[in-house]
Amino acid sequence: MFDKMKDIISEQLGVDANNIELDTSFKNDLDADSLDLFELVLAIEDAFNVEIPADDVSNLDTVEDVIEYLKGLGLEA
């Protein structure tokens, strides 16, 4: 799941996948703004066939936060 997540983030935010770690913060480390995050969430929803409510998005600061959230929805790593 981490590799797939890195690919999505790299494509959506235009960053090198090698610079993405579990503790990478979307805002602080990748300089993502609210529009970037919105587009990233849409891409994650499409890739994993899930829906992430807007209220939950604000709690997803790092790559690991998203992976743990997806695991909580029953997706396997």
Residue ranges and their predicted role:
Residues 48-77:
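C-terminal structural segments of small proteins and small subunits
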Residues 1-18, 72-76:
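Thiotemplate assembly-line natural product biosynthesis machinery
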Residues 31-41, 63:
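Amphipathic alpha-helical interaction surfaces in cytosolic regulatory modules
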Residues 2, 37, 50:
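Functionally critical, cavity-lining and gating residues within the transmembrane helices
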Residues 12-31, 48-59:
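Phosphopantetheine carrier-protein modules
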